Regions:
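Glycine-rich beta-strand-to-loop/alpha-helix junction loops that act as flexible
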Residues: 1, 32, 64-67, 171-180
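Glycine-rich phosphate-binding loop and adjoining helix at the ATP-binding site
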Residues: 2-59, 93-95
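Generic secondary-structure boundary/loop-capping signal
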Residues: 3-6, 10, 82-85, 106-110, ...
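Short, functional N-terminal and low-complexity linear motifs
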Residues: 4-5, 85-93, 126-129
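ATP-binding/phosphotransfer module of carbohydrate and carboxylate kinases, centering on a glycine-rich
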Residues: 20-23, 73, 97-180
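Short, well-ordered, mixed-charge alpha-helical segments that flank or form enzyme active sites
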Residues: 36-39, 69-73, 120
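Single-residue recognition of alpha-helix boundary sites
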Residues: 42-43, 77, 125
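Glycine-rich phosphate-binding loop of actin/hexokinase-like ATP-binding domains
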Residues: 51-110
């Protein structure tokens, strides 16, 4: 197929239209997280290392909570596997326990780990809609609901990263990226 539609925005991209408009020989449409993994060599000097470690293979996991939740895996810095991990539901019921929330509805991982998730969970608990930035400010000011939400977010992110690192055997590291 020559077209893709974004899942969290109202955009549709078509390779034929892009090729014609920009007079290109070829046009490849990539998943956003596939592009992020391919860009590693171009941005590696600006990466902030949170924890040093020894690599035991060349598999790197890229994860980014932002508007949604994106992820990809790069093997030997050549083969990139794009994922739609944000749309998965396998572990979400147990992650809701990090926020002391019970739900009978279908919840995706990005409903728990993303900037919009922080806002939505805060609204569920406080009946007030705030941006994730405003909630982080409240967290710094020791607001109990913001603390509960941010602590639940961090626990959920850590648990999910652990599961994904095991799933993809990312012995080359885990890189966090995105707008959050």
């Amino acid at each position: 197929n020559e077209s893709i539609a974004m899942t969290n925005r109202d955009y549709i991209f078509n390779t034929n239209e892009i090729t014609k408009k920009f007079n290109l020989k070829k046009c490849y449409l990539l998943n956003d997280w596939e592009a992020i993994a391919h860009s590693f060599n171009y941005v590696c000097d600006s990466i902030i290392n949170i924890k040093e470690g020894e690599s035991y293979n060349n598999t790197v996991l890229y994860l980014g909570p932002g508007t949604g939740l994106g992820a990809s895996v790069a093997i030997n810095n050549q083969f990139v596997l794009a994922t739609e991990v944000g749309n998965t539901t396998n572990s979400t019921k147990s992650l809701l326990n990090n926020f002391n929330i019970e739900s009978n509805t279908i919840v995706t991982l990005e409903n728990i780990i993303s900037g919009s998730a922080i806002s939505n969970i805060y609204k569920l608990k406080a009946n007030t809609l705030l941006t994730s930035e405003e909630i982080l400010d409240k967290y710094v000011q020791k607001d109990p609901i913001a603390i509960d939400v941010m602590d639940g977010f961090i626990k959920s992110l850590a648990q999910s990263l652990s599961d994904l690192a095991l799933t993809f055997n990312s012995g080359g590291g885990i890189l966090l990226a995105g707008s959050l």
